[in-house]
Amino acid sequence: MSAPDLKRAAAERAIPLVEDGMRLGIGTGSTAAAFIKLLGERVRAGLKVTGVPTSEATRIACEREGIPLATLEDLPELDLTIDGADEVDGSLRLIKGGGAALLREKIVAVASRRMVVIADASKHVETLGAFPLPVEVNLFGIGATTRAVEAAVARAGCTGEIVRRHEASGAPLLTDGGHAILDLRLGRIPDPEALSAGLWAVPGVVEHGLFLGIADAAILAAAEGDTAVVSVLGRL
C-alpha cells in the first residue's frame, strides 16, 4: 500500500468529523490535500461548511474543489481544524511546517475549538526531532537571529545544524508572510517545551514548528499487507 493510499485512509477517517454548518480550519501539505479532495466531494453532495485555509496553496486547492472560504477576520473562532503533521509523539506534541505554512497553521489551529491531525503512521515517533524543525524568522538581521537560535538550541540540550531552506530552484524560500525558514536538523529534541521557550525568547523568531498542547487527536493510517489500518491517538 502506497503512502498516498495511507494519507487518503487517514483523511477518510476524518471526514465524518465535519458536520453541516461547521467553520473549518483546513491544513497544508500532502495529507491535507487528500482531505481537501474528499471534503470537496462532500460539499458538492450538499454539505455546508466554511473553510479557513492555512496557506495560499490550500486556498487554491479549496477553490478548485468548490469549498466556500473565509478568513479569520471573518470567522475568528473555528469549530475544527484538520491538518497533517511531520511528526507526532505519544503526548500529541507535533512538528509541523514542512510545507512552510507553520505560522498560519498555528494561528488557525489555536483559533479552533479542536484540532485533529491526519497522517500516515510513519509520522508517529517516540521522540520528536528526526524531522527538521522549521523556525520562521524575519529577514531583517537574519544572521544575528540565526546565531541566537543556535544558542537557544544549545541551552535546550540539543545539537545539530541550522540550514536556511531553499526552493527547488535554489532560491531562498520565502513563506506566504514574506519570512525565511531555518530548518533545525537536531536528530532528537529531548525537551520540546524547553526548546520552544528558548526559541520564543529570540526577537527575530516569528514562529516555530513545535505544536505543544494544541492537537486533540491524531488519526494514523498504517499498512498491513494491502489494507490500511487506522488508529487514533487522543479522543476524536
UniProtKB/Swiss-Prot annotation:
One Gene Ontology molecular-function label: ribose-5-phosphate isomerase activity
Matching Pfam families: Rib_5-P_isom_A
CDD domains given in the database record: RPI_A (cd01398)
Ion transport in keyword set: no
Gene Ontology terms: biological process: pentose-phosphate shunt, non-oxidative branch
Keyword DNA repair attributed: no
Keywords: Isomerase
Top-level taxon of origin: Bacteria
Principal EC category: isomerase
Pathway info: Carbohydrate degradation; pentose phosphate pathway; D-ribose 5-phosphate from D-ribulose 5-phosphate (non-oxidative stage): step 1/1
E.C. code: 5.3.1.6
Binding site for substrate: T28, G29, S30, T31, D83, G84, A85, D86, K96, G97, G98, G99, K123
UniProt xrefs under InterPro entries: NagB/RpiA_transferase-like, Ribose-5P_isomerase, Ribose5P_isomerase_typA_subgr, Ribose5P_isomerase_type_A
Residues at the catalytic site: E105 (proton acceptor)
Catalytic activity line of the entry: aldehydo-D-ribose 5-phosphate = D-ribulose 5-phosphate
Assembly description: Homodimer.
Similarity field: Belongs to the ribose 5-phosphate isomerase family.
Protein task: Catalyzes the reversible conversion of ribose-5-phosphate to ribulose 5-phosphate.
Protein name (Swiss-Prot/TrEMBL): Ribose-5-phosphate isomerase A
Upper taxonomic lineage: Bacteria, Pseudomonadati, Pseudomonadota, Alphaproteobacteria, Hyphomicrobiales
Annotated gene: rpiA
